[in-house]
Amino acid sequence: MSKTTALSNAFITVWYHSDQKIVHHQIHKYICGSPLREANNVGTELLRQHGACKWLSDDRNAGPLPPEDLQWAHDVFTPSAVKAGWKYWALVLPEKAVAQMNMKRFQAEFAQAGVTVQTFSDPEAGMTWLESL
């Protein structure tokens, strides 16, 4: 599988798997604000540029999001990503229970917007599911 790094910093790495047309990110440590928004915007642009519709989120190291990031995700990220073509989301859930609550909210929001969401405990299982679609 051909994997290209689109963004890499101390908080997060975003890749694009060209053979399977999958956007993939891995959170390395707590992320919020500008770095989070930049990563989500990079992923959305990858969906748009490549006509991709699958995203693997490895959010095991994610923490709870502040209200302003939750609002930004609702107002900006969700509609933009769906418009860019996002249809399938493999979500590796955060280890922290409080962060899982944020993800459950996002799951419901994206499902309502037409994105099929499956949750996983490891990224390999999520990738396998996306590759099967």
Predicted regions: what they are:
Residues 2-133:
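Amphipathic, Lys/Arg-enriched alpha-helical "gate/interface" segment within cytosolic domains
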